[in-house]
């Protein structure tokens, strides 16, 4: 199979799953997505507008989103990262990724997930978590032995989701994130594979 013809490392095919009565397509990030940066920008910027507990707090420009997509596809091509997209009616409603940390931490994959507000609490986040971990084991070289994540200590629904999927809290660093004018802690969690 030629992995460069628009479908980079396509061992994960698109799947349609039903969550709370909504047909959601789960698929890998594709080269053709470079032509659609606006739909990804709208998704990310919706989280900023919502004031979600995510690390970034500034809306992205179209140029910044294009650069992000290009860099992510480059990581996928090098087998250094995996990235999946959840879409409902062609609107991005969630993403999940794992990227190898590199060098002496090449056995560690950094996990990230974002889900649009109206799609939380319906099982989508858990499904994306399972799928991205499975995909990381198939595609990343070297295969990660540890998945690491960082989350706002105040984001209890996310922490509970991660615990449900086997992540263990290993550290809480106080005053690492600024949220709503206050400093809040950062919780570090690991999943040993």
Identify the meaning behind each predicted range:
Residues 2-20, 173-175, 182-193:
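Terminal substrate-recognition subdomain of acyl/acetyltransferases
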Residues 145-148, 152-159, 164, 175-193:
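C-terminal "cap" of GNAT-fold acetyltransferases
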Residues 29, 113-115, 151:
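Hydrophobic adenine-recognition pocket in adenosine-nucleotide-binding enzymes
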Residues 108, 136-150:
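Conserved GNAT acetyl-CoA-binding A-motif
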Residues 115, 121-138, 160-164:
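Conserved acetyl-CoA-binding loop-helix of GNAT-fold acetyltransferases
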Residues 19, 58-118, 129, 135, ...:
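Acetyl-CoA-dependent GNAT
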Residues 6-59:
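A short, well-structured alpha-helix characteristic of acyl/acetyltransferase catalytic modules
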Residues 169-171:
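A secondary-structure capping/hinge motif
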